[in-house]
């Protein structure tokens, strides 16, 4: 394994209820394929929700998650700290009002974690 192959990126996908499955899939699949083509895990990811419970996408498919917001706050202080956070949302995003999520996103950003949005995730980032 060379030095380049030891560099790993950890990505958190924060799933908002009614998130766009197609936006999520088109973000995560290239990471999976890159790992396969490289022959090592250059990218790892976890799915997060506010409470750690499954989140239903806009197509009614329910996705299990790996962590809650509380878990992510703890991870920020440890080696599980992500390189990036993507907010995955979709329809009805203007109804999403969660001060804990907004504060957590600011914490991530202030600690040097790249933060971005998928589909209408930019709407949440602008809040």
What residues fall within each predicted segment?
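Extended, subdomain-level signal for the structured scaffold at the beginning of enzyme domains
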Residues: 1-115, 124-127
